């Protein structure tokens, strides 16, 4: 689950991490009032959306007067912000965060993720702050310095000092960085995070480190023990179809293609998408109905796919290990009868009760296209989506 920048910074403050003073604005009146409360004569106005690239898209701007903040709010509040991380529709801007500014000497990067190979938290620091860290890692990997957190001992101050030295910090800056490093690691563990990012972490002209931006992604599987974080969830930033899928324990991710995919098992779902792409098609979604799929869940999954107006064909690829192919077949028939369908549906069934499943589909009287192999299914789906 993603948090907004202002929410992450509120949590940062609880952990004694340095952040600028800011005010959350839900309306134009809030913003006008905020600039008379905040110090200074220049403020940063930031659209609050669950996506990066806000600055390049015009969603972050320095404002110096009431007229400028009015213009910014009128431009964005109630509108949608499109960045390189969103789809073509963008994300709704319901909130603007207005905060005090500072004079910047240097921009750094500091982030943490779970390294699955070592099963430990890995911190990454770089002098290339304010940039896309993926680009830095690909083009100049030598600029990224790492520190691994042992889960038994936790983050140690000496690790923070080592990173500070590598970043070229000196004097009191090293002490500041070590404190920041230890507190961020504590936050990461206590809040069950999947990702934590401060980009940029700035060194001000006064020699102080300041978290100018904050990104937190919480492990959704751990939300049951963090009701205070669950309460921060913003449904408006989530795809409505993905939210509906979660109600049925379906793993769904919307994409921008035109071939709907329904598969059981995450690995098989990824492989299905790959082979569709290999044959020139574009998957419209990732959808894993899971190993314990019921007829009702399959029916809901099918309706979910058909709710996407871009879908021109549907590919159902089921390998019956835990799930039975005859149940999948009944779910498909129920969904088609309930929703109605005028696009081609290609079905490939293998495994437990596959023959029975194919027989049920064949006797349904519906216009379903049977495929014997995954390759054949992908080829048929691509042709069907192209209207051939």
UniProtKB/Swiss-Prot annotation:
Q: Which Gene Ontology terms describe the biological processes this protein takes part in?
A: succinyl-CoA metabolic process; tricarboxylic acid cycle
**Might you give the EC number(s) for this enzyme?**
6.2.1.5
Cofactor field: Mg(2+)
**Superkingdom:** Bacteria
Q: Which GO terms describe its cellular component?
A: cytosol; succinate-CoA ligase complex
Positions annotated to bind ATP: 46, 53-55, 99, 102, 107
CC cofactor note: Binds 1 Mg(2+) ion per subunit.
One annotated GO molecular function is: magnesium ion binding
Quote the InterPro entries the UniProt record gives. Answer: ATP-grasp_succ-CoA_synth-type, ATP_grasp_subdomain_1, Succ-CoA_synthase_bsu_CS, SUCC_ACL_C, Succ_CoA_ligase-like_bsu, Succinyl-CoA_synth-like
Binding annotation for substrate:
264, 321-323
In this chain, Mg(2+) is annotated as bound at 199, 213
Spell out the family assignment given in the record's similarity comment: Belongs to the succinate/malate CoA ligase beta subunit family.
* Physiological role: Succinyl-CoA synthetase functions in the citric acid cycle (TCA), coupling the hydrolysis of succinyl-CoA to the synthesis of either ATP or GTP and thus represents the only step of substrate-level phosphorylation in the TCA. The beta subunit provides nucleotide specificity of the enzyme and binds the substrate succinate, while the binding sites for coenzyme A and phosphate are found in the alpha subunit.
Could you give the subunit structure recorded for this chain?
Heterotetramer of two alpha and two beta subunits.
UniProt protein name: Succinate--CoA ligase [ADP-forming] subunit beta
């Amino acid at each position: 689950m993603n948090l907004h920048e202002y929410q992450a910074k509120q949590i940062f403050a609880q952990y004694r991490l340095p952040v600028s003073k800011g005010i959350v604005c839900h309306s134009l009146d809030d913003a006008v009032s905020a600039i008379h409360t905040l110090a200074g004569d220049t403020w940063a106005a930031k659209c609050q959306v669950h996506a990066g690239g806000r600055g390049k898209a015009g969603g972050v701007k320095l404002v110096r007067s009431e007229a400028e903040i009015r213009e910014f709010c009128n431009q964005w509040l109630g509108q949608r912000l499109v960045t390189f991380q969103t789809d073509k529709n963008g994300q709704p801007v319901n909130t603007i965060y207005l905060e005090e500014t500072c004079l910047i000497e240097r921009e750094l990067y500091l982030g943490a993720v779970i390294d699955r190979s070592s099963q430990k938290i890995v911190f990454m620091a770089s002098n290339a702050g304010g940039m896309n860290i993926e680009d830095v890692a690909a083009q100049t990997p030598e600029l990224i310095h790492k520190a691994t957190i042992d889960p038994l001992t936790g983050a140690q101050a000496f690790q923070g000092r080592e990173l500070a030295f590598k970043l070229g910090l000196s004097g009191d800056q090293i002490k500041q960085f070590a404190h920041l490093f230890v507190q961020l690691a504590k936050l990461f563990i206590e809040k069950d995070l999947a990702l934590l990012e401060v980009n940029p972490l700035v060194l001000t002209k006064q020699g102080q480190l300041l978290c100018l931006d904050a990104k937190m992604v919480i492990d959704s599987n751990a939300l049951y023990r963090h009701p205070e974080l669950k309460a921060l969830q913003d449904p408006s930033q989530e795809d409505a179809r993905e939210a509906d899928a979660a109600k049925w324990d379906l793993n769904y991710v919307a994409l921008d293609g035109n071939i709907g995919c329904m598969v059981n098992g995450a690995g098989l779902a990824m492989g299905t998408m790959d082979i569709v792409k290999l044959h020139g098609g574009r998957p419209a979604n990732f959808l894993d109905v899971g190993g314990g799929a019921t007829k009702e869940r399959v029916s809901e999954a099918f309706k979910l796919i058909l709710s996407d107006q871009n879908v021109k064909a549907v590919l159902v690829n089921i390998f019956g290990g835990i799930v039975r192919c005859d149940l999948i077949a009944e779910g498909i028939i129920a969904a088609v009868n309930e929703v109605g369908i005028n696009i081609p549906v290609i079905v490939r069934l293998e495994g437990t009760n596959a023959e029975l499943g194919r027989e049920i589909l064949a006797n349904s009287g519906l216009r379903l296209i049977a495929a014997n192999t995954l390759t054949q299914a992908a080829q048929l789906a691509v042709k069907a989506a192209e209207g051939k």
